[in-house]
Amino acid sequence: MKHCATQTLESERLILRRYQAEDYKAMYKNWASDPQVTKYLMWPTHPNEEVSKSVTEDWVANYSNEKYYNWAIVLKELGDEPIGNIAVVDMNELAESVHIGYCLGRSFWHKGIMSEALQTVIDFMFTVVEANRIESRHDPRNPHSGGVMKKCGMQYEGTLRSADWNNQGICDACYYSILRNEVQYE
């Protein structure tokens, strides 16, 4: 893969950009403090802004790594305030494969925002980084996340039983993927 670190990406309604130190307040307010958002995630709900600040500081420090891809999701009409997160959370260099994770503030659910963000990252990972495979997974009790993956052309590969863990405990994991040769770019 041709790594180039987290680049600013733009779609019709969104800017996907690097986190900045001051983004912790928006992170806490818009998604990290909401137990409904974190219900099926692998990290706990943030009890205070200090936790969000520490996480944001770690993310900002990692931007010097060319293999680090982590974006703040910004809705253009709202200015520069992050409303969610999308990132490469795992990578297999030999298979040229990346695993994408994402979350979005609850007030922005069911508006096509996460599908737009995921499609933007898929396009970047295939055309710039030249990944061969992009995958993601979700808890079957969170079918809307699978809907995001399907909307972006990802194919359901199967459900691994009791193979994952999230804030609900041990859970099944529904896997989806898309391959570079399944997408046509001009």
Report each predicted region and the residues it spans.
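A short hydrophobic/aromatic micro-motif that marks alpha-helical segments and, especially, helix-coil
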Residues: 48-50, 63, 168, 183
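Short, conserved alpha-helical segments within structured domains
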Residues: 44-48, 69, 141
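Juxtamembrane helix-loop transition sites at the ends of transmembrane segments
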Residues: 50, 57-60, 174, 179
